[in-house]
């Protein structure tokens, strides 16, 4: 059973929004009492419980805007609110529910927004976390549905029964429509009604669907028969197709060796072309190699006469010499960089020493200033403290320590004086506080005595009022007693007259007559049943005749249907009308059409073979043209890539000219270095121009020399660029030479392509004529083919028609035989249906008489019940008479108790007056003592503050002096004068070392320049050696190329190109013959394929392909639909019966509880009982209607039930609503034992309040054994609280000084109340 454990509220209505405003309440079993004044926030607790469980805002809150704390109160733009609730679900596991809301103020408009709703699963009661989940969020699931599931009750019960809002608490006496909605929601009738409507709708749809399926199955059966015929024809065509395919495979096998040999011949042709291309390439390379050899021979100044190995050795020796010179250059550069690094390091060292020297001088100045400031501060502080100084501290600095110790001793003395004053002040203050505490204790005792006396007076006063009311009631009951005796006499007279008016003998005679009439009808019913049994014995033979007749009518209809369907086709296929042997006549027509089509097909196939031969020739020509055009396009693209738009011969000549020019430029650059050096040498000897011999000034000569030197330095790069350009141009020239065969091939293709295209044009003309003639033949085949297909499609119906005619004749004969077997005594005018109708009529009369008998018996029973009720009323009146007499007997004791209470109240009033007179002087004395204590304490504090201020200034000055003394001692330890002298010596040594290093750098630089000049002079020799090596390599390459050309000539001679070409022509003729034969077979195969495809397409149509499956499926669906209709009818009846039974049982239980609670609680005598009346709405009693109910609350007055709405007082309305809610909670909330009552005493008088308390106490005692039972009562009536029995604690709701709602738990005891924070 689920229950509530705790609730936390923040930012709801008058509850504050800040963290310290959070209010919590822990609910206890069996009763949780919440007490508070009007408007302090009691009802807000119920609203929060309801909102946490259902997510619905309370009524009148403007969709939640006034439910959250108003932001206008504290001048905020938005307010966040949160409700946290911890519960135990119906399985006992702990669940935490948290709902967060926000109200924002934008442009003076308020908007409410739900921020988040979360369920957290806690562990508890032996339950693990639910399905390994920690929490559920409102973004992923419906939180309200989940909470209803956890609590074990529906949302309607939570809203309307368990946590009903005070404004909606009187809903049981609301208007009829709203009351019906509430009860339907509580019973869950709405969902069940939806299920019933769904079942009714499904049953109707199934019945309509059954009619449609029964009509459609005839068409499905016809398609199944058509499918079987077409499948047989398809299998014959496929067997013929397989035979032709085998012949085609034989042709392909004959062509395979021919094709293989043709592939080999093409490979030989490819090899010949490849060797020819290689030969052209080798010739080109050989010629280029010779040209390069001649060019290099001209460039070399000094040819090398040895071998290539000797030349490599010479180059290696030269490289060794150059390597030694480079190594020496690297060593000199390394030494120079090492010396430079040493110089830089020495300069950095000198800079570091300079910085240290400056820092030492600054510290020395700071030391002198610190010592001067220390002496000044010490002298001033000693004068302030009156400490004498006997020596000069400048000349004797060692005396400084003694002076500082004297200062420290004087400061400690001042601190001791302040401590003594503080102790004296505290002692005086404690004595004054003792006096104040004594006065306060005396005052508290007096006030507590007054409070206790007032409480005792109040309780006595309440008891006195209660006794007065009881005495008045007993005095007035004397008159009631007389009325009661009169009423008892009246009831006795009514009972006696009712007994006389009932004639039991007459009633028994009427019942006997009814029973005799029922017996006569039963005899007639039995006679009719025997007649039906006789007809039933003949029913089989009659039924067979009827079935035969129906079958005969069906066959005649089928014959008429088939004849009507094909009446137009009969006129088209037959010249004369036919009446029998339809299938045989149709087969004759079919064979005639087949022979005609076969003749036309043979002519068409002959023409098709011609067409295919032309088509093959055309495809071969197109293939050759495409291949030649592709080769032409590729060759032209290759030529374009190499030559662009320039003619090939012009480009070849231009490339050759460019190579010659580049070779000349390369040679000129190689020789220009020696020429420039010669010019420079001459200008050094005589400053004049080497060309015009013009005398130049020294500056002009120097500029020209520099310019020529720069040109010499650029020569290696210029030579490298010239060599790259020359090699690139040579490669281009070689590529152009390789392009020569492609040029020749393009010319050949351009000559042969027009011839091929002309041949293709002639073949296409012949192909067009052949296609036209073939199409004409195919068109002629169309009409007989259509007629043959029509005859073929009608063949099945003709078989059915012949079969139907035979069946019709057979059924006519069988029907005549069966009619002759019927007996002569059989009366055909008397049908079984008439007897069955008469039997039903007698059965209804029997049922009517039985109902009349039952109503008569019920009337007798009602009369007896009326007598019993009168007897019960008489007994209850006598019980009440006895109770009133007992009250009259206790009247003297009550009056005596009232007099004692009045005298006690007088005594207590005088004692309270005396105690209040003593309290005022005690308050004045206490206030005077407190003021005197505060005045003296303030004066002492001011004096002490002055002393402390002076002491703190002494302490600060002493701290500064100690700091200066510490700094002076630290400076003395550094010995700064000697440090400055050492740094001066180090700086002078570093400067001397730097001068030596600069001299070494100058020497090494000159040596490096000499080595660089020697290296540049060796480059000319290196170039000559490399040219000799390149010449040797080219000579070897030329010899190899010459050998390769000879080998290619020999290979081309070995390939017999003429015999290969002749063999290719013969094989091509053989292949063409086989292709023609294969074409003929393919033509036949195509025709058969068209038939197969046509049949396959027809079979693959959904109506034929799925015909068998659809036929079976249709039968299954019809049977299943019938069963579904029967099952849905049974399900609907079962569900409605269960609903009616559930509703009646629950309403009976609810009304029983309502009567029981009303008699316990209500103390009036005008209403005997109340109950919820259920009225069934009248509707047509069809299978597709469901029952609905209306609800109303009625009251019984003088044994007459009248509607309570509009006929009861405000108190009766409240009490009736409360009792109905109690009964509903007892009935429907078996899984949740929580019930909240908000202000249950509203509009109730004291008697009904007391009886309500007694009833609630009884409910609590009965349910106390259930640990999860919880009754939450919210009230402002403290007398109601005191009447609820043993309440050990309750929760008080009040407003604090900020007008925010606060919840405190109050322990209720006999003499004290303590507030305990939650």
From Swiss-Prot:
InterPro entries: P-loop_NTPase, Rad50/SbcC_AAA, Rad50_eukaryotes, Zn_hook_RAD50
Cofactors: Zn(2+)
Gene3D superfamilies recorded: P-loop containing nucleotide triphosphate hydrolases (3.40.50.300)
Cofactor: binding comment: Binds 1 zinc ion per homodimer.
Coarse class of the protein's main subcellular location: nucleus
Coiled coil: 189-256, 305-333, 434-641, 645-685, 713-741, 830-1101
Catalyzed reactions per annotation: ATP + H2O = ADP + phosphate + H(+)
Mutant phenotype after disruption: Death during pupal stage, possibly due to the accumulation of DNA DSBs and the induction of apoptosis in third instar larvae.
Positions annotated to bind Mg(2+): 43, 166
GO molecular function, one term: ATP hydrolysis activity
BP GO terms, sorted: chromosome organization; chromosome organization involved in meiotic cell cycle; DNA repair; double-strand break repair; protein localization; telomere maintenance; telomere maintenance via recombination; telomere maintenance via telomerase
Keywords per UniProt: ATP-binding, Cell cycle, Chromosome, Coiled coil, DNA damage, DNA repair, Hydrolase, Magnesium, Meiosis, Metal-binding, Nucleotide-binding, Nucleus, Telomere, Zinc
GO CC annotation: chromosome, telomeric region; condensed chromosome; condensed nuclear chromosome; Mre11 complex; nucleus
Compositionally biased residues, Basic and acidic residues: 454-466
Annotated phenotype, changing residue 281 to Q: In strain: NC306
Binding site for ATP: 13, 38-39, 41-44, 68, 70, 166
Outcome following mutation: residue 219 to V: In strain: NC335, NC362 and NC390
Effect recorded for residue 208 to D: In strain: NC335, NC362 and NC390
Enzyme Commission numbers on file: 3.6.-.-
Chain positions recorded as Zn(2+) binding sites: 689, 692
Residue intervals of the Zinc-hook domain: 645-741
Complex formation: Component of the MRN complex composed of two heterodimers RAD50 and MRE11 associated with a single NBS1.
Role this protein plays: Component of the MRN complex, which plays a central role in double-strand break (DSB) repair, DNA recombination, maintenance of telomere integrity and meiosis. The MRN complex is involved in the repair of DNA double-strand breaks (DSBs) via homologous recombination (HR), an error-free mechanism which primarily occurs during S and G2 phases. The complex (1) mediates the end resection of damaged DNA, which generates proper single-stranded DNA, a key initial steps in HR, and is (2) required for the recruitment of other repair factors and efficient activation of ATM and ATR upon DNA damage.
Family to which the UniProt record says this protein belongs: Belongs to the SMC family. RAD50 subfamily.
Domain-level remarks: The zinc-hook, which separates the large intramolecular coiled coil regions, contains 2 Cys residues that coordinate one molecule of zinc with the help of the 2 Cys residues of the zinc-hook of another RAD50 molecule, thereby forming a V-shaped homodimer. The two heads of the homodimer, which constitute the ATP-binding domain, interact with the MRE11 homodimer.
Name of the featured protein: DNA repair protein RAD50
Native source species: Drosophila melanogaster (Fruit fly)
Lineage of producing organism: Eukaryota, Metazoa, Ecdysozoa, Arthropoda, Hexapoda
